[in-house]
């Protein structure tokens, strides 16, 4: 089982010491995973979308932890929450956000390596990520749900992901 105990990831009830791979790059080979393992890394923070399904199998096999990230990145739309600003705060986009978050969850939920889910990457916070958080928490009872750009707002579980943080 995976949980969150006072901001620290817990695996089967025991705190997990985490060290995140600093730069994932665009592709990951089995030899890269083994090299990262030798260097003491055990956590991969995936980018938004476009990750090969074999990566999850490799991480399962080699004992890496993974934070799965939904394929949402609205960084090109700016960070404005005003009307006409970022789509994250536009209710017209809510169904699309929920669909992407849910698809990301259902695609990866059975991989033991997936220890947390991230709502989006580089997007303004707003109603669609609030609703996405609530929706995902309704589906996932144990693993943390994160949004690194939440800025201390309630739609991200508090979790330290690396000793360097």
Residue ranges: model-predicted function:
Residues 1-38, 57:
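N-terminal carbohydrate-binding accessory modules
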Residues 29-31, 43-165:
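Substrate-binding/catalytic cleft of secreted carbohydrate-active enzymes
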């Amino acid at each position: 089982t995976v949980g969150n105990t006072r901001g620290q990831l817990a695996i089967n009830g025991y705190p997990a010491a985490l060290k995140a791979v600093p730069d994932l790059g665009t592709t990951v080979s089995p030899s890269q995973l083994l090299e990262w393992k030798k260097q003491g890394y055990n956590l991969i923070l995936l980018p938004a979308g476009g990750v090969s399904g074999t990566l999850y199998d490799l991480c399962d096999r080699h004992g890496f932890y993974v934070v799965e990230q939904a394929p949402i990145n609205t960084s090109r739309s700016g960070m404005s929450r005003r009307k006409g600003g970022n789509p994250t705060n536009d209710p017209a986009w809510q169904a699309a956000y929920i669909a992407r978050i849910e698809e990301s969850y259902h695609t990866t939920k059975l991989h033991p390596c997936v220890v947390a889910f991230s709502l989006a990457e580089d997007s303004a916070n707003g109603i669609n990520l609030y609703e996405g958080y609530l929706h995902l928490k309704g589906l996932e009872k144990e693993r943390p749900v994160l949004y690194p750009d939440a800025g201390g707002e309630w739609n991200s579980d508090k979790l330290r992901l690396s000793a360097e943080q």
